[in-house]
């Protein structure tokens, strides 16, 4: 599969037998646009919402109809699933790379943190990414691949619009809505995925990894392939 290079199999016990667990269990087969459109919203629409604008990705769907009626728009289909997962990365100095004979996948060239009003916590990646780009002396046009964690579809679209992402470069193998969101591991997970995808694409020189954090925070890192 697409993620084989970045997945470490774990042996688990199924009944009386130990078997390798090496495939994500969250992605679901048989999902249709019609089924998605029938799902009920999860959260009430607040009259205090800073930006009640609705983004409709399917034509037609029940999502737009719900929006027109002031009904909830976030559903189980356009929100990330909470699942189990772990990820690991190694960050080393240039001296350590030379001393231990390491072969780095990429160099960290920019990073940033930002905070926004908790009511719009999902857009935290916007100030964080702008800060990281500034530190690296780059613009968004210099970025070849983006891994941006998806809390909800509306949240990720808001970030993409504010940062003017080229969507052909974003979450090219699926984001948290498709793959799931292992809380506490998503930051490392999207970096692992980003670096592996950069290795597969000769033209991909630089990548951006960013995600929102509860309470209004956002974090972003930029990598250059070695």
Locations of the language-model features?
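Glycine- and Gly-Pro-enriched alpha-helical subdomains that act as flexible
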Residues: 94-142, 160
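Helix N-cap/coil-helix junction residues
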Residues: 2, 102, 138, 165, ...
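Short glycine/threonine-rich loop-to-helix capping motif typified by GTGT followed
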Residues: 18-23, 118-125, 150-168, 182-187, ...
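N-terminal extracellular/periplasmic Venus flytrap/periplasmic-binding protein-like
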Residues: 1-94, 99, 162, 167-169
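Cysteine-centered functional microenvironments
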Residues: 72-80, 112, 144-151, 170-186, ...
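Electropositive phosphate-/nucleotide-binding environments in soluble metabolic enzymes
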Residues: 1, 30-33, 76, 80, ...
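Predominant activation on well-ordered alpha-helical scaffold segments within soluble catalytic domains
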Residues: 33, 37-40, 88-95, 126-130, ...
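Conserved beta-strand-centric core segments of catalytic alpha/beta enzyme folds
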Residues: 71, 75-92, 187-226
